[in-house]
């Protein structure tokens, strides 16, 4: 049923993971009615349970390529503001997607097929239809990473050197929309994120180090993970996120330090993440943007 008060409603285009649920809870705490566009290929079915127990939540399931259906649903529900939250696997976007006529036309007009170009074009279509796409950190500013160490220990001298190098490399690849994460060991770049995501990149770095010969036993314990926002990060989508699963991937890979960009990276379940990092002896630090 439509809501004539667009300002009292929020559309939530939900991908996978906890991000959509955290944003949903924050929006409901602000008294907003939330209309969820749940992606069949990505969104956790727990979203249905939220709608069952909360009359202020409405869930509509649709496939990733159904742009026209998304717009029609949001307009029917009286939504004039929407957010994107949660990851959508890059391989889903660029290989598994079955676009409707509207999305197919949009894809044909893209100069390059990267995430920024695609989501920016989708945002423009939504805006043209009277639906403003808002920052995905809306209501979640307290979860943005602070400057400085978040854990009991900060980075040591070797890790600080790897952070400085990793920041240069990570910002370079992020500028080309290739990924946001690099893994460094003793001044050498071990792994660079592409389509696989941060945790898979960390896992791959650990596998690479284990596959090396004599020096691996030393270097494996010195893996430093650096994750950054893009130089011109659009906070409406693809904002960097870390959490307890990131720390678990690091622990399994033998990584000892995580550096993220303060004020531009969301830290989910910070208390649990920091506790896990402290237990594993991993340093977690926020670096000032542009620092």
Segments predicted by a language model, with ranges:
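General beta-strand structural signal in soluble alpha/beta enzymes
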Residues: 12-14, 36-37, 82-85, 115, ...
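N-terminal glycine-rich phosphate/adenylate-binding segment common to multiple enzyme folds
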Residues: 67-140
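Conserved mixed alpha/beta catalytic, RNA-binding, or beta-rich assembly cores of soluble enzyme
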Residues: 13, 17, 27, 132-247
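Flexible, glycine/proline-enriched loop segments at strand-loop-helix junctions
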Residues: 10, 58, 103-116, 149-159, ...
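Feature captures the catalytic cores and cofactor-binding loops of soluble hydro-lyases/lyases
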Residues: 39-72, 76-79, 96-105, 200-291
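Solvent-exposed alpha-helices and their adjacent loops that cap or buttress functional pockets
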Residues: 1-6, 51-52, 75-77, 125-126, ...
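Catalytic domains of riboflavin
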Residues: 13, 20-22, 43, 124-134, ...
């Amino acid at each position: 049923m439509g809501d004539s008060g667009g300002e009292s409603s929020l559309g939530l285009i939900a991908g996978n993971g906890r991000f959509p649920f955290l944003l949903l809870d924050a929006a409901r705490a602000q008294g907003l009615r939330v209309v969820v566009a749940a992606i069949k290929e990505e969104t956790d079915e727990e979203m249905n349970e939220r709608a069952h127990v909360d009359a202020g939540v409405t869930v509509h399931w649709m496939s990733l390529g159904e742009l026209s259906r998304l717009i029609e649903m949001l307009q029917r529900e009286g939504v004039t503001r929407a957010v994107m939250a949660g990851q959508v696997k890059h391989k889903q976007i660029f290989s598994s997607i079955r676009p409707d006529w509207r999305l197919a036309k949009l894809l044909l007009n893209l100069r390059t097929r990267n995430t920024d170009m695609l989501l920016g074009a989708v945002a423009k279509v939504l805006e043209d239809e009277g639906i403003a796409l808002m920052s995905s950190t809306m209501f979640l500013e307290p979860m943005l990473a602070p400057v400085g160490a978040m854990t009991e220990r900060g980075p040591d001298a070797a890790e600080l050197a790897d952070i400085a190098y990793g920041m240069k490399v990570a910002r370079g690849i992020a500028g080309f929309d290739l990924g946001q994460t690099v893994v460094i060991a003793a001044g050498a770049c071990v792994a660079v994120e592409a389509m696989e995501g941060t945790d898979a990149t960390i896992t791959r770095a650990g596998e690479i180090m284990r596959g090396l010969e004599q020096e691996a036993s030393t270097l494996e314990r010195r893996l430093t993970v650096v994750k950054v926002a893009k130089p011109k990060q659009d906070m409406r989508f693809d904002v960097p996120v870390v959490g307890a699963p990131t720390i678990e991937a690091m622990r399994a890979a033998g990584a000892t330090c995580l550096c993220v960009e303060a004020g531009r990276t969301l830290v989910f379940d910070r208390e649990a993440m920091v506790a896990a990092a402290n237990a594993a002896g991993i340093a977690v630090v926020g670096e000032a943007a542009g620092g």
